[in-house]
Amino acid sequence: KRGCPAACIDLDNLDKLVPASFTEKADGVVTAAEVEQREGVSTEFARPQFTEQMRDEGWTILAPQMAPYHFELLVPIFKRAGYNVALLPSVDHGAVDAGLKYVNNDICYPSILVTGQIMEAVLSGKYDTDKLAVLITQTGGCRATNYISLIRKALKSVGLGHIPVIALSFKDLGEENPGFKVTPKMLYQAIYALQYGDLLMMCLYRTRPYEVEPGSANRLFQYWMDACKHQLERGVRQSEFRRTVRRIVEDFDALPLAGEGTKPRVGVVGEILVKFHPTANNQIVDVIEREGCEAVVPGLIEFFLFGIAGG
């Protein structure tokens, strides 16, 4: 009807997360944000740096979850280098609600989940927010580059804009954090960790659907996860890595199985975080196995090789 305010109906593309939101804006109403924008006020977020003093004082660095098996193996590498990294839980349904509270629901699901993980942890009361930093990987070309801005915006909205957000990237993003440096030695150990993670994940998913004794594959997997973490805590050598890989394969080969290879194999592909994160994919591997199939998930190393090949 002429002269009436227009109603903007915003339909979410996130299935069953939130209802459609209705917003109305009357003619002539100018928000404070629009006034600032028109006056040329900068909306850039402050960039608190993570300093060497913060590292030496043992500040907690929160790292959001993506690939539980792999990231769990990366933590000992950071701790060995003097960083007090705390990896967030792999299954956390409250993270989605927290993300929707602080991130516009038009943003993609991975961005909501990652921001939600961090905000839920920051506001949990478990950590001293005056001695807290956040670590987030940055790639480029999509929302993965926007994570850091989304997190800073969310922190600022609850009065915690002083928390440093560290961008972990091999590209020049204009971020300066003198207290956080990834050394060639750390990178070398990380390659071992990711290869261990890929191997253990593939061995587990290949054997668990056929195990004779329920839980035996998980127990063997956890044994080798603990062993690999101990190695990474003191530093892995190439000869030790080769021996460990052979022993892992031999142990899983010796696991009592029934009907190996007879079940349909179901591949899991797609966006990197959703593919690996149990909460993001609604425990898709467990669902596949409960339905009498075998899940096949490509390794995380393949993702990085794909990126390298693409230049």
Predicted ranges, named:
Residues 1-311:
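An N-terminal assembly and electron-transfer interface module characteristic of large anaerobic redox
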